[in-house]
């Protein structure tokens, strides 16, 4: 998800997306630990997406 798309969302929607992405990251880490995750790059992409969402949420709240 691009930063421009995130900025068009409302603060509540961004928070919901953060929760969803955090849950997905937890599941991906669990799959990675058990050896079931084939695409490990997805874990890093999700981590960066959460960071991007949190950064833009702080910008919106100011």
Swiss-Prot record:
Would you say which domain of life the source belongs to? Bacteria
A cellular component term, taken from the record's GO annotations: cytosolic large ribosomal subunit
Record keywords, A-Z: Ribonucleoprotein, Ribosomal protein
Which Gene Ontology BP terms does the record give? translation
Q: Which Pfam families match?
A: Ribosomal_L29
Signal peptide (UniProt feature, chain positions): none
What are the GO MF terms of this UniProt record?
Answer: structural constituent of ribosome
User: InterPro entries under this entry?
Assistant: Ribosomal_protein_uL29, Ribosomal_uL29, Ribosomal_uL29_CS, Ribosomal_uL29_sf
The UniProt entry's sequence similarity note says: Belongs to the universal ribosomal protein uL29 family.
Q: Which PANTHER family match?
A: 60S RIBOSOMAL PROTEIN L35/50S RIBOSOMAL PROTEIN L29, LARGE RIBOSOMAL SUBUNIT PROTEIN UL29C
Q: Per its record, how is this protein called by name?
A: Large ribosomal subunit protein uL29
Record the organism: Desulfatibacillum aliphaticivorans
Classification lineage: Bacteria, Pseudomonadati, Thermodesulfobacteriota, Desulfobacteria, Desulfobacterales
Gene (name only): rpmC
């Amino acid at each position: 998800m691009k930063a421009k798309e995130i900025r068009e969302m409302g603060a509540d929607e961004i928070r919901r997306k953060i929760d969803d992405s955090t849950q997905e990251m937890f599941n991906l880490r669990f799959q990675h630990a058990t050896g079931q995750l084939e695409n490990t790059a997805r874990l890093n992409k999700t981590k960066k997406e959460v960071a991007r969402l949190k950064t833009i949420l702080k910008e919106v709240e100011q």
